[in-house]
Regions:
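Residues at the N-termini of beta-strands
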Residues: 81, 116-118, 256, 292
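Short, high-confidence coil segments that cap the C-terminus of an alpha-helix
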Residues: 51-53, 113-116, 231, 288-290
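Active-site/acyl-donor-binding loops of N-acyltransferases
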Residues: 2-12, 17-21, 31, 44-45, ...
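A gly/proline- and charged-residue-enriched helix-loop-helix capping module
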Residues: 88-135
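Aromatic (often tryptophan-rich) hydrophobic motifs at membrane interfaces
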Residues: 101-109, 219-334
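A conserved beta-strand-loop-helix scaffold within acyl/acetyltransferase catalytic domains
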Residues: 15-61, 65-77, 123-128, 133-150, ...
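Flexible glycine-rich active-site/ligand-binding loops centered on an Asp-His dyad
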Residues: 84
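Short catalytic-loop micro-motif centered on adjacent basic/acidic residues
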Residues: 118-120, 187, 291-295
C-alpha cells in the first residue's frame, strides 16, 4: 500500500466534491476519520454487483460536510435503497447539529431525485454521551439494524513498536513468539495468489456460518484497489512445506488500515499462525507510514477474545440510522430484505455446530470478522 501522507492544498467546494472523484478522494484521505466505504474506489468495487453511487456535499459556514451514497435497486421494486457507510465526512471528523441538518437536506433532495425509499447511514462517530443520537433523531433519522460492525478496536500506529507490544495481552505476545518457533513465516503477495486467499477465507466463513461471496468479487476488489495502493495481501506460510496456512486482505484509506478479510487453516491454527500474521500486518503497516489500524469489529465471543489480545482502544459507534424518503418504498424494501434474510438463514441452517454457538473453534483459527452484506 502507498504512503498515506497527503500534501496540503486549498479546500474544495461542495460542487467539486460531488462531481470530481479526485477531489473527493483527496478530501476523504485528508479527513480525520477516512473510511474505504466512502471512497470512489469502493464504489467501483461495488459496481459489478449492481450498486451505483452518488455524492452529496454541503457548505456549513467555513466547513464542508459530504457523503457518498451507494444505491441498490432490487428487481421488481421501483424504489432503491441508499447506503451511507462510515460517513458523512468532515475534515475534522466532527458532526454538529448544523452539519447534520445540512447533509440531511441534501440527502432528501438527492434521494427523491434517485427515487430511493430510504437512506441508511452508519456514521464514523462514537456513541459517547448520546448527543449525536439526539441530534439525528431531531433531524428525522430513526435507529436501524447495523450493517457494519457497531464496535471495533483501533490501534494507534503512531506509537513505537515497544509500546504496541506492551499494549498486547501477555498470552498474545506468547502466541506470536510460539508461532515463530513452530515454523511460520509471513510473506506479502500479489493478485496471482487470490485463489489461495479465497480457498482459506471461504472455508473460514463457511465454518462461521457466513455466506461466502464469489471468488470474482475478491479478485475484482484486488484489481481495483491494489493499483490505487489501497490493498495489501499477506500470507502465513509453513516454513517446512511452504503451504499457505493463514491469510489477511488489508484495505486502506488515507492514514487508516482496515483488517477486513482473512482466514486460517487447521494447520495454521495448530501453529498459531493467525497471531504472527496479525502482528506482522500491524508492524508492516506502521513501517509504511499508516497511523491507525482498525481491527474491524468485535462481533462474536471467540473473535473478540482473539482481537482484543492485540490491545487498542475500543470504539462503540453511534450505530445505524434510516432516513425515510418514501414511506411506501421503504416498506416494500424492508419486506424484501426480510425475505432474503430468512432464505439466508435457511440455506446455512446446518453450518453452525450446536455445541459451538459462539464460533469459538472458528475464532481460535483466527478468522477475520465476517463481512457485512452491503459494505464489501
Amino acid at each position: 500500500m502507498t504512503d498515506p501522507a497527503r500534501a496540503a492544498g486549498p479546500g474544495p467546494t461542495a460542487a467539486a466534491l460531488e462531481g470530481d472523484d479526485a477531489a473527493w478522494e483527496a478530501f476523504l484521505a485528508g479527513s480525520a476519520a477516512p473510511s474505504h466505504l466512502q471512497s470512489a474506489a469502493w464504489a467501483a468495487v461495488k459496481r459489478p454487483n449492481g450498486w451505483r453511487a452518488f455524492r452529496v456535499a454541503a457548505e456549513v459556514g467555513d466547513r464542508i460536510v459530504g457523503a457518498q451514497v451507494l444505491v441498490q435497486r432490487p428487481r421488481g421494486v421501483p424504489w432503491g435503497m441508499g447506503y451511507l457507510g462510515r460517513g458523512p465526512v468532515t475534515a475534522d471528523g466532527a458532526l454538529d447539529r448544523a452539519a447534520i441538518l445540512a447533509i440531511t437536506a441534501r440527502l432528501r433532495t438527492a434521494g427523491r431525485a434517485h427515487r430511493l425509499g430510504y437512506v441508511r447511514m452508519e456514521p464514523e462517530l462514537e456513541a459517547g454521551d448520546g448527543r449525536i443520537a439526539r441530534e439525528l433523531s431531531r433531524a428525522s433519522w430513526h435507529r436501524a439494524p447495523h450493517v457494519q460492525p457497531d464496535r471495533t478496536l483501533l490501534l494507534d500506529l503512531a506509537q513505537d513498536e515497544a509500546a504496541l507490544l506492551a499494549g498486547m495481552h501477555r498470552k498474545t505476545r506468547q502466541s506470536v513468539a510460539k508461532s515463530e518457533r513452530l515454523g511460520v513465516r509471513i510473506v506479502d503477495a500479489d493478485g496471482s495468489r487470490m485463489s489461495e486467499f479465497y480457498a482459506i477465507h471461504t472455508d473460514a466463513m463457511t465454518r462461521a456460518g457466513i455466506s461466502p461471496r464469489s471468488q470474482r468479487t475478491y479478485q475484482d476488489m484486488w484489481d481495483l484497489l491494489a493499483p490505487r495502493g489501497m490493498a495489501r495481501l499477506l500470507f502465513a506460510e509453513a516454513t517446512d512445506t511452504g503451504e499457505a496456512i493463514a491469510t489477511l486482505l488489508l484495505v486502506c484509506c488515507g492514514r487508516r488500515v482496515v483488517d477486513l478479510y482473512g482466514g486460517t487453516t487447521a494447520e495454521g491454527g495448530r501453529r498459531r499462525a493467525n497471531y504472527l500474521l496479525k502482528w506482522e500486518a500491524i508492524r508492516r503497516c506502521k513501517a509504511a507510514g499508516f497511523t491507525e489500524y482498525d481491527l474491524w469489529g468485535l462481533p462474536r465471543e471467540g473473535i473478540e477474545q482473539f482481537k482484543s489480545g492485540f490491545g487498542g482502544r475500543q470504539v462503540d459507534y453511534v450505530g445505524a440510522w434510516d432516513l425515510t424518503i418514501s414511506p411506501v418504498g421503504k416498506r416494500l424494501l424492508d419486506l424484501g430484505a426480510a425475505g432474503r434474510e430468512r432464505y439466508r438463514r435457511w440455506r446455512y441452517r446446518d453450518v453452525h455446530d450446536p455445541a459451538d454457538p459462539h464460533g469459538r473453534r472458528a475464532a481460535a483459527a483466527g478468522e477475520a470478522t465476517p463481512p457485512a452484506d452491503d459494505g464489501s
